[in-house]
Amino acid sequence: MILYPNCKINLGLRVVRKREDGYHDLETIFVPIYGLHDELEVVPADTFSFEQEGIKVDCNPEDNLIIKCYSKFAKKYNLNSLISIRFKKNIPFGAGLGGGSSDAAHMAIALNELFELGLSKAQLAEEVKELGADCPFFIYNVPCYAEGIGDKLTPIDLDLKGTRILMIKPEEGVSTREAYSGITITGEGLGDLGKPGILGNLNKFTNDFEKTVFPLHPIIGEIKKRLLDAGAYYASMSGSGSTVFGFFKNNPEGSTDAKLRVLKEEFASMVLLDDTFGEWKA
């Protein structure tokens, strides 16, 4: 079977508190982006194999989240066959898009179907939580209000159908450690903003990491400014960066489109996606 692990963006991201275990409690809105995805093919086989192409995954095979997920399921559920995995990496690293977490979650979905494990989405989400804080979100893969370390999820009604999204990522990435290095914790979450009807309050959805990341990587802040100048009604860095996205009213005959063409030409090598939201894939 073939799956297409997609990425996500964050609408707002508040760092609420540092926990005793060293992690941080967050509040954010996760939004799936189906148009930018990796490719994952998993089939039963007599011998185990893993073939990877696309963007180079710079880690030992045993540290790859796809392999970790398979190892976890093979041991816990005594899977009765080995598998062959073909994987193409398209979602960049250090981008704030959750690509690795999505790969692990979709691997779990594949194993659940291939081996007829009968696990519910809630059970799958619990299984993948230890692989990455964002992993449970990709099991549901619809807009969610996220709390805790990103693992406490509440699906929300978010209508972005017809909205145009432009995603730009500079060559430089941002490590999670770097993003947290100078963060100021205010203790303020999203509050009522995280509830249905958020589109009218989008400009209040700020990303706390921007205050840390923009001074260290001025190009990221410049991209956000340029998106707004080009007519985006909302723009933000996603997660801990370095991807920045802008929402536009889909008006191809208007002046916004002319400004967007200029912007896309200037940042041509950095554009990850220019797409329009459709229906959510529940």
Regions found by a protein language model. Name each.
Residues 86-115, 133, 233-248:
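Glycine/serine-rich anion-binding loops at beta->alpha junctions
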Residues 2-5, 12-28, 117-234, 247-282:
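ATP-dependent small-molecule kinase catalytic core of the GHMP/sugar-kinase superfamily
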